[in-house]
Amino acid sequence: LRDFSEAIQLGLNSYIEKYPMLNEVSRFTLNTDVKVQATQPGEGYHEWHCEQDGLSRSERLLLCMIYLNDVDEGGETEFLNQHLRIRPKCGRLVICPAFWTHFHRGNPPINGVKYMINGWMEFVDD
């Protein structure tokens, strides 16, 4: 978890350089309740979704994903409004807003298992 947190912090620093107004929102931190996923060939989260889909997840600000292996065919994380597919590569970090602007889905790997870690930057009470 420490390596994941360190990688997220480095990526977040770059993200804030690109979007400096992020420093103007309420205080936030990495939720340590991360999710390790192993997606088998033909599986995936096929439904379009966003990470903040109502009051039950209203504390989520950013989605943070790190791919733990390369996937040669399929397995992309696809973003609807951005018309973007991100191929899993070991160590690749993806950070995006948790909001409705970034609906996404996990396309199924064709062969081989896709491994990744998901975490969320969340608003915290002062």
Which residues make up each language-model segment?
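Fe(II)/2-oxoglutarate oxygenase catalytic core
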Residues: 1-93, 101-126
